[in-house]
């Protein structure tokens, strides 16, 4: 009864109970193929993702944030959407305006950018078995994962040649160079071997696009490919990339990491308490005996 009348004790008990529930339940319900792959280097591709929840997306918990970007970056994101059908820009607050405080000749956009979609494409090197497995998954699920390889030699800016989202003739800042009709000009590879690609092809492909560049000997071939980061995540881990508290710089799920840390702290506290109790009991017994 005295415990129940003490508000501080009740509050502390509730907090401890919530911490226990968080530490015990969250690692169980959030345990999946992604969180249990602790040594997976693919994690690094999904670093610093923002908190996202389908249930609370209406409240701004949608994995996106407001940014001010240049017109070149805006065109870059638009080109990503043209290829993938996924727009990294979820909302435009202010479009194509000049900033008197900027030294750049560019105009700017105030937009909301999805941290998940903005990753775009990834450059991967696959084994023959991995290459075939993705193609089989594409056929089974009718979802495009592998996209055509590009002729990086036709990109003038050396720093952009390794950018997997550049699939078109571009300026030195990554913005598309449009043809006379205002269309983007693809630079997809049409020559060379791609390991007999036999799966889904993107719209507009007449069968000439190459979906990989093959390196190595016939005994140990490697396949360099461009994959869509969202659909590749689904293929590899079996679910959409959605993280309630986002991810850290290493791509680790923050919610799961927090719960595992809380569980370790509670376990450590129990061990220390048990040690203190044992030492106290022995010391007290010795003092009482003598």
Task: Name each model feature, range by range.
Residues 14, 18-21, 39, 269, ...:
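Residue-level signal for alpha-helical context at structural boundaries
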Residues 11, 254-286:
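Transmembrane alpha-helix signature in integral membrane proteins
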Residues 19, 249, 260:
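Short alpha-helical basic/polar micro-motif
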């Amino acid at each position: 009864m005295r415990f129940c009348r003490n508000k501080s004790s009740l509050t502390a008990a509730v907090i401890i109970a919530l911490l226990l529930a968080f530490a015990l339940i969250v690692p169980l319900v959030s345990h999946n193929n992604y969180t249990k792959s602790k040594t997976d280097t693919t994690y690094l591709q999904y670093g610093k993702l923002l908190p996202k929840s389908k249930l609370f997306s209406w409240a701004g918990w949608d994995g996106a944030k407001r940014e001010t970007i240049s017109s070149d970056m805006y065109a870059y994101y638009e080109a990503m959407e043209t290829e993938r059908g996924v727009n990294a820009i979820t909302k435009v607050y202010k479009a194509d305006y000049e900033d008197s405080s900027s030294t750049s000749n560019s105009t700017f956009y105030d937009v909301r950018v999805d941290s998940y979609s903005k990753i775009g494409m990834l450059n991967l090197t696959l084994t023959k078995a991995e290459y075939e497995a993705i193609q089989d998954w594409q056929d089974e699920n009718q979802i495009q994962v592998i996209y055509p390889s590009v002729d990086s030699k036709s990109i003038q800016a050396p720093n952009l040649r390794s950018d997997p989202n550049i699939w078109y003739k571009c300026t030195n800042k990554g913005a598309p160079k449009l043809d006379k009709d205002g269309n983007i000009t693809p630079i997809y590879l049409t020559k060379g071997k791609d390991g007999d690609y036999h799966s889904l092809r993107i719209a507009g492909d007449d069968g000439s696009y190459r979906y990989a560049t093959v390196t190595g000997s016939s005994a140990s071939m490697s396949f360099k490919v461009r994959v869509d980061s969202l659909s590749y995540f689904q293929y590899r881990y079996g679910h959409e990339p959605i993280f309630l508290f986002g991810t850290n710089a290493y791509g680790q799920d923050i919610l799961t990491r927090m719960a595992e840390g809380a569980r370790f702290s509670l376990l450590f506290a129990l061990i220390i308490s048990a040690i203190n109790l044992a030492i106290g009991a022995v010391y007290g017994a010795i003092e009482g005996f003598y």
